[in-house]
Amino acid sequence: MSDPRYQVDVSVVTHYLADQSQPEHERFAFAYTITVQNNGEQPARLMSRHWVITDGDGHVEEVRGAGVVGQQPLIGAGKSHTYSSGTVMTTKVGTMQGSYEMVADDGKHFDAIIKPFRLAVPGALH
């Protein structure tokens, strides 16, 4: 988004959860920690999320819901909000991407884009 009042950047760190996975049953658990950084001039509330989850076989699942981990945080200008969540896949590798619907203090609705990020069991990729 080019309007400096509404600039939100999203960064992601992922981890494979070996202790919660069951490879013999095609169950691979991943955690991700997301930081939503409000680089805009307006405080903004994260209202909802939209995820597109693609496994290593190309199967796509879409998830929509209010807020993140039960919250709709208000993120001040120059501030950030960090949270952790997770997902389970049936393949060793996959991707997630999506967007957050944001509402600025002035009432403007805009999307914060979550660029694709990889979920992978260590050693699964060459």
Curated annotation (Swiss-Prot):
ApaG domain boundaries: 2-126
InterPro entries listed in its UniProt record: ApaG_domain (IPR007474), ApaG_sf (IPR036767), Uncharacterised_ApaG (IPR023065)
Cysteine disulfide partners in this protein: none
One of the protein's GO biological processes: error-free translesion synthesis
Name of the protein: Protein ApaG
Gene: apaG
